[in-house]
Structure formats: C-alpha cells, structure tokens
Amino acid sequence: SQIGNTPLVRLKQASELTKCNIYGKAEYFNPGESVKDRAALYMINSAMENNKIEKGGTVIEGTAGNTGIGLAVVCKEYGLKLKVVMPNTQSEEKKITLKNLGAELIEVDAVPYSNSNNYVKLSKKIAADLSKENNHGVFWANQFDNLDNTKAHIETTAEEIWKQTAGKIDGF
C-alpha cells in the first residue's frame, strides 16, 4: 500500500523555541494527502476481513471531507463503490476531488447533529436502506464511532514513529 510509512520532519522553529527536537509526521505523502487515509484503509480492511463488504460492495459515509477523500482512494483501489453524504457548505475543491476519485456525492443542508437530517444521521439511514438490496455488502464506515479509526493510528502511526525515533520519545 502507498498509505503510511510517511517520514518524520523536524520542525525547526518549534525545536529551536523549545530547545527540544519536535517532529511532525508528513502525512501529506499519503495518496489523499491526509492522515485520514490511514483510518480509511484500516476501516475498509477490517470490514473486508470481517466479511462486512466485498469487491463490488458499497461504502457509505457522512463526512465533511478528508475521511471521504481517504475512503475514495481506498475504495477506488479495492473496487468498491462509495457514497459520501456531506454538507453542501463544503468547498468545491473537496467535492471535485471526491467526484474525480469516483465517489457519488449526496449533498445535504448543513444542520446540527441533533437534527434527523444531519449528514451523519442520513448516511446511516442510506446505508441501512441500501443494505437491503446489495449482494456484495454495504458498509457504513461510521468514522466517529468506529474503533478501527483509532486502531489505525495505534497500530500504524504510533509504530512508525516508535521505529523512526528508535524508541526515543519524550512526549506524544
């Protein structure tokens, strides 16, 4: 996979100001140019390993951007369809990127989470409705509550940082 194994970059000004070596993880080297690519890959791999979805299946997610882009990168590679439910207030650049990566956009009004028409709640409903008619599986990524989102960083990002620093870390 082209996702992960990103370099550490020493942040010169922060290091000089603190008299410590401060590093940042250059996640912009991922194909979707974001740390969210890791979470997307991990969530999709887990869903496939647990037979929640297979090639030809559909991933649904409510997202305002970067997780959707990460999912689009992974779905395109794995032969999965992606439907992204997003607030219509998002930038045209994000929308174009998602469409260019093959995602189907479902734009909705931006409303509070408490509203039943919130983009996250609508994505859950769409996934439930679609699962009744899809033979290859429908996977609601559910990034906000999906523990694989966090595990991605425990099992990949943290491991990489540990190796790249030879275990010499004073703070995280």
Can you say where each PLM-predicted feature lies in the sequence?
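PLP-dependent amino-acid enzyme catalytic core
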Residues: 1-172
